[in-house]
């Protein structure tokens, strides 16, 4: 199943680079993630690992902020895309990207204990680990390579948003497929109906995975919030500056509300390595 995920992203690197700028909902995921990272990270330069960082959207942003960043990903396609994109970045970003490496989040043996001041694991990397033992391994590895007291930022794909979207778009054939009920009953999706293999989380399940493996959850955020899965509707509002400004204000107020977190497309956990 790991190979299926790798193969998917090997052929999806171009789309992944543009995914967060393609529509207003993706943009919400991007700006909200960046906001909460910058809320907790110091302004001084620190060393960051961006594991599962794809073609480098967040890694380049962190490098532009002055941090020293290692970008790592399982997908060869994403790594090649990141390397090509880096050539077109500013001198500041180029100098602060320390390495672009191929790595599996369940085994970060190439880095010593406490090698990084902070770690990013964004975009649903943990969701692509179907075996719970692998998810535990991944959290333990994130904890191990991050310094004590350092912040770890992890986002996953929410289960309720996936189920609501299926109903909203009237995906009748997918709803009748056994995979739909597997998602409902907490089992994993094998990727046979599109996208790729995935485990979709409830907020409390995600929180438990983190806390049970030694991380202190400081804050949880619904990255797309009230706009989750409403791409067409959000686009209609996006064209009106005043209306969209009010949507952003509502998002800022409610993105950490427990109900909004649990129904968001992506859920971000801000964790401290206790």
Which residue ranges define each predicted feature?
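Conserved class I S-adenosyl-L-methionine
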Residues: 1-54, 57, 61, 151-181
């Amino acid at each position: 199943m790991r190979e299926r995920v790798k193969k998917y992203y090997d052929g999806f690197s171009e789309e992944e680079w543009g995914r967060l700028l393609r529509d207003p909902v993706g943009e919400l995921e991007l700006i909200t993630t960046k906001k909460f990272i910058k809320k907790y990270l110091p302004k001084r330069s620190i060393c960051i690992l961006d594991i599962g960082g794809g073609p480098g959207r967040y890694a380049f942003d962190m490098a532009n902020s002055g941090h020293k960043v290692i970008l790592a990903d399982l997908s060869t396609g994403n790594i090649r895309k990141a390397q090509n994109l880096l050539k077109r970045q500013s001198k500041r970003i180029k100098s602060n990207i320390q390495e672009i490496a191929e790595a599996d989040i369940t085994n970060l043996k190439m880095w010593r204990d406490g090698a990084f001041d902070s770690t990013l694991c964004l975009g649903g990397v943990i969701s692509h680990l179907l075996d719970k033992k692998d998810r535990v391994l991944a959290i333990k590895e994130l904890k191990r390579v991050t310094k004590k007291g350092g912040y770890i930022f992890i986002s996953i794909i929410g289960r309720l948003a996936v189920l609501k979207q299926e109903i909203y778009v009237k995906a009748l054939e997918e709803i009748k497929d056994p995979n739909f009920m597997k998602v409902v009953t907490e089992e994993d999706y094998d990727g046979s109906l599109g996208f790729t293999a995935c485990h979709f989380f409830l907020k409390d399940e995600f929180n438990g995975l983190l806390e049970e493996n030694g991380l202190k959850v400081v804050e949880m955020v619904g990255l797309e919030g009230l706009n989750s899965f409403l791409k067409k509707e959000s686009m209609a509002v996006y064209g009106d500056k005043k209306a969209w400004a009010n949507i952003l204000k509502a998002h800022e107020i409610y993105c950490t509300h427990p109900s909004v977190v649990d129904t968001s497309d992506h859920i971000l956990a801000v964790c401290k390595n206790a």
